[in-house]
């Protein structure tokens, strides 16, 4: 009887083992700068084998200051997409995103897409320098602070969400 019970316990443990698939419940791109391809709209961050991509028209980044408390708002949709990808190898450069024909490797292991309805907030300020001798102020660029509000990512039946996620600062020339 003890042997039968032991066999049943072993079978149960073997059948309940994890299959090894990676389950993403969050990501961290805090220490990574935003990048952009020279001739394409998407903004993205690369962190090792991970990619976080914001595909939004450049018209959301005019060189105009947003009033205090009134950021530009874009709703996550088929035109304003946020995508998280996990690759099978480290991304050494931006060729995965910027190439007309993407390289054969690395391969996407998982892709999580933000569902429609979340919010992308963009607050724009001027970057300036002041000449110490003349006091003349020169605009050196515009800083676009990007936040995701109530954004949910899905992959099949699994999802995770961010109530408030700071994507980063994207700087444009004056």
Regions found by a protein language model. Give the residues of each.
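Flexible beta-edge/linker motif
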Residues: 140-142
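Bacterial Sec-dependent N-terminal signal peptides
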Residues: 11-39, 174
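Generic structural motif
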Residues: 20, 49, 59, 125-129, ...
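A general structural signal for short secondary-structure junctions and capping/turn motifs
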Residues: 2, 35-36, 136-137
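Edge beta-strand at a domain terminus
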Residues: 144-174
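Sec-dependent signal peptide recognition
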Residues: 2-8
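Surface-exposed helix/loop patches within compact recognition domains
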Residues: 41, 45-138
């Amino acid at each position: 009887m003890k042997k039968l019970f032991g066999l049943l316990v072993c079978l149960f443990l073997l059948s309940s083992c994890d299959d090894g698939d990676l389950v993403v419940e969050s990501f961290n791109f805090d220490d990574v700068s935003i990048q952009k391809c020279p001739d394409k709209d998407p903004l993205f961050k690369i962190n090792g084998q991970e990619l976080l991509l914001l595909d939004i028209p450049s018209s959301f980044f005019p060189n105009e200051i947003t009033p205090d408390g009134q950021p530009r708002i874009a709703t996550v949709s088929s035109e304003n997409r946020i995508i998280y990808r996990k690759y099978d190898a480290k991304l050494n450069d931006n060729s995965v995103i910027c190439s007309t024909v993407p390289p054969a490797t690395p391969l996407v292991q998982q892709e999580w897409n933000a569902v429609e309805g979340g919010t992308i907030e963009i607050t724009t300020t001027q970057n300036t320098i002041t000449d110490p001798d003349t006091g003349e102020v020169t605009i050196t660029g515009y800083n676009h602070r990007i936040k995701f509000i109530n954004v949910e990512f899905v992959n099949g039946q699994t999802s995770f969400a961010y109530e408030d996620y700071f994507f980063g600062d994207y700087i444009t020339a004056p």
